[in-house]
C-alpha cells in the first residue's frame, strides 16, 4: 500500500474582529497567499506535477463560493490543468479535505495534492457581503471562464468541436 505524507503546513493569522486587519481580506486571496508560500518553500516540487487541490470550507458561498479551491489555485499560479475541489463538512471541512487528498494518494490515483481549509466569517456575514464580494476581480479579469456555468461551458465545447445536439 502506498503511503501519504504531509510535506509541510502553513496557516495564516487568526482574524478575531470585524474591525481587525484581516476583515476585508478575501478568502481566495488569503488561501492563494498560503499556496504561493508553500510553492516557494518547496521549489523541488514542480507545480506542473500537482494533481489536485482539495480545500475544505464550511460556508462555500459568497466570497468563499464558486469553488474556492480552483480559484485560489489559479491565483497562486498553479497551471490551468490542475483541478480543484471544495469540500463542505462544516467544522471538519479542512480535516475532511486532507483525508480525501490522502486517500487519493494512497489509492494511487494521484501523487501530489494541495489540501487544507479556508474560512473567513467577515466575508460571509450578511447577504450584502455574500453578493458584493462573490466574484474576485483579479480572477474575473484574467480567468473569466472559471465563473462560467456548466451550460455556457457546454456551448463552448459544442461550438469548438462541432458537436451537434
What are these regions (language model features)?
Residues 1-4, 17-45, 62-66, 73-165:
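Acyl-thioester C-C bond-transforming condensing/cleaving domain
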Residues 55-63:
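A glycine-/small-polar-enriched, mobile loop at the entrance of the PLP active site in fold-type I
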